[in-house]
Amino acid sequence: FFSKLKTKDKLSIYWNKVYEPDHLKLDKEIEKILEKKNISFKFFKGNILNEYQSITKNDGTPFKVFTPFWRNAEQVYIDAVPQKSSEIKKLKNKKNIFNSKDTFKQIMPKKDWFKKFDQYWKPSEEEAHKSLKEFINNRISKYGIDRDYPSINGSSKLSPYIRNGQIHVAAIYEKSSKDIKKNTSIRKYINELGWREF
């Protein structure tokens, strides 16, 4: 796809990083193509709190033990959070360069096994934030115990929303850490966000 772009196309390309090795390698290949064609681009931190290479021990090597890693990583994140939200400017000119004629029916599997997930997960940013709010209001205070019992609805169930970019871990951290000093279960939940990055 990127190799078909022409230098005369007036566009800028933006994307968020995905941190699996194959994706990082692909990012480098895309960078080379865009630089060669003189097309401007910018990529941003993915759905994480910190870039992995920014959290190291004093000697510059990666942490091998979770507790010191997370103590350091959480502080780096807190120190970097801006004090107030910046205003997001709307894009004035946008061009759709994806001309796929595939319909929803064509790209979905022939068997409708995926329909059962409708009762568990409704994909949207709005639903992700509703789920987070419901978890904070009703279950986070007992998360430390309830998460260990599959028969209890004790987890946040936010994984698919995080995976598909419908909620950012920074929003989860910000909203769920408000009462962190009052409840050890909240601390345990926040630590789970750290495990994603470790």
Which positions does each model-derived feature cover?
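Trp/Phe/Arg-rich N-terminal binding region typifying the photolyase-homology
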Residues: F1-V81, S185
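Glycine/tryptophan-enriched, flexible segments
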Residues: P62-E197
